[in-house]
Amino acid sequence: MSTSVSPVVRLVRGDITDQSVDVIVNAANSSLLGGGGVDGAIHRRGGPDILAACRELRASRYGKGLPTGQAVATTAGRLDARWIVHTVGPVFSGAQDRSALLASCYRESLRLAAELGARSIAFPAISTGIYGWPMDDGARIAVRTVLAETVEPVEEVRFVLFDAHAYVEFEEVLAMR
């Protein structure tokens, strides 16, 4: 059984594909075959090995796609990381509370990173782009889950945020912890 830890949490404004960490988390779509936003950037910068690994996963285990809230690891290709952990965030719905699925993305990514022996992990703000999740709520769920669910050997968690608005929202949540 893994031991819970209080990770060092860092906020970084920039491009997640520039991070030097053990695990980069990809906010993937269920096809695992690349898309827009973070997903597209990771596939473009990481090169064809990531897509090849994702195609193999689709053929062997995820024929219908990776379910929302789950996570799976592949090579990091040309990125300065050991692995990419792909997770599928929920599309925001004002009519249905899907926050448990969003928390599951962070929890399952952390669990998988720990199983892989990772000490550092970089997350984007999952579901806050095209999937429409409000940034303030997405930041609260992300930070709360990371603080509660990080286990050894993970020591450092980075939230890599593309714009100033996201950075400020995460900064405010971290200041209240």
Swiss-Prot record:
Q: Which SUPFAM superfamilies match?
A: Macro domain-like
In what residue span(s) does the Macro domain sit?
1-177
Cited PROSITE patterns: MACRO
A Pfam family reported for this protein in Swiss-Prot or TrEMBL: Macro
Q: Which family does it belong to?
A: Belongs to the MacroD-type family.
- Entries under NCBIfam families matching the protein: PRK00431.1-6
Query: Under which name does UniProt file this protein?
Result: Macro domain-containing protein in non 5'region
